[in-house]
């Protein structure tokens, strides 16, 4: 392990390409200056991290909703927009008989079983994630077969992570939104380095950086890396309004704890 920060050590097995990309991202170099293979790797890492995060959120909601049959409780965190979106997908991918009985309470149990056993639920949810968020998501069978999976997806539909996912996949390669996409890349890339053992973080970092600190753990560790390496950072010409207009999240809060 090689020390690359006061609180960071680098796994010696990490290829030079990984460290090279990390350095360029933390210098705030424009994504257009990256080589093709670097961009492909960054995009793959970012979409993988988003996929992992969404699966964790779905697992959490599935555990919350397991065994619950009360519609009021299941629907407590779901927006009407989600149900309208889901119904529009159902109309495209379901037969006329199912749609005819869709709003008949006495047929609800039958329709639910038919959708699950036919595999339509899995197909509809996968279509939703691809069409809405640009993400090909392979949800584990243990989660997708859970009886309340439609409610679990609805509970995370407006989550910050999915808003980030929508923004990232919609504007990847868009030069006008490049600074905002680059910010997302930087944080997701750093998360990948930590979570997949490329970087080893000292436990002292968690004592220094607490949940109430606005900047967040990733920014704290990124600054540690830059200071230790004597790295200068290019100005970030970030269009904060562009992020807020699409996600409802300010640039400052995008990856903060709050």
Curated annotation (Swiss-Prot):
<dbReference type="Pfam" id="PF03049">
    <property type="entry name" value="Herpes_UL79"/>
</dbReference>
<comment type="similarity">
    <text>Belongs to the herpesviridae UL79 family.</text>
</comment>
<protein>
    <recommendedName>
        <fullName>Protein U52</fullName>
    </recommendedName>
</protein>
<dbReference type="InterPro" id="IPR004290">
    <property type="entry name" value="Herpes_UL79"/>
</dbReference>
């Amino acid at each position: 392990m090689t020390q690359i920060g006061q609180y960071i050590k680098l796994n010696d097995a990490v290829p030079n390409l990984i460290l090279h990309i990390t350095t360029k991202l933390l210098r705030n170099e424009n994504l257009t200056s990256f080589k093709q293979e670097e961009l492909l790797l960054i995009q793959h890492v970012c979409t993988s991290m988003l996929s992992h995060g969404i699966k964790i959120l779905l697992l959490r909601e599935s555990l919350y909703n397991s065994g619950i049959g009360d519609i009021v409780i299941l629907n407590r965190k779901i927006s009407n927009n989600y149900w309208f979106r889901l119904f529009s997908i159902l109309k495209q991918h379901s037969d006329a008989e199912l749609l005819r009985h869709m709003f008949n309470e006495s047929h609800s149990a039958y329709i639910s079983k038919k959708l699950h056993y036919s595999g339509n639920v899995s197909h509809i949810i996968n279509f939703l994630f691809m069409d809405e968020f640009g993400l090909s998501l392979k949800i584990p069978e243990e989660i997708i077969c859970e009886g309340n999976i439609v409610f679990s997806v609805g509970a995370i539909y407006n989550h910050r992570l999915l808003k980030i996912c929508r923004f990232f996949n919609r504007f990847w390669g868009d030069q006008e939104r490049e600074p905002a996409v680059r910010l997302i890349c930087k944080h997701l890339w750093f998360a990948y380095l930590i979570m997949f053992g490329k970087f080893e973080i000292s436990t002292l970092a968690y004592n220094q950086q607490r949940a109430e600190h606005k900047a967040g753990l990733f920014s704290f560790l990124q600054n540690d890396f830059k200071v230790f390496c004597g790295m200068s950072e290019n100005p970030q010409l970030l269009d904060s309004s562009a992020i807020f207009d699409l996600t409802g999240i300010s640039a400052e809060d995008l990856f903060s704890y709050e």
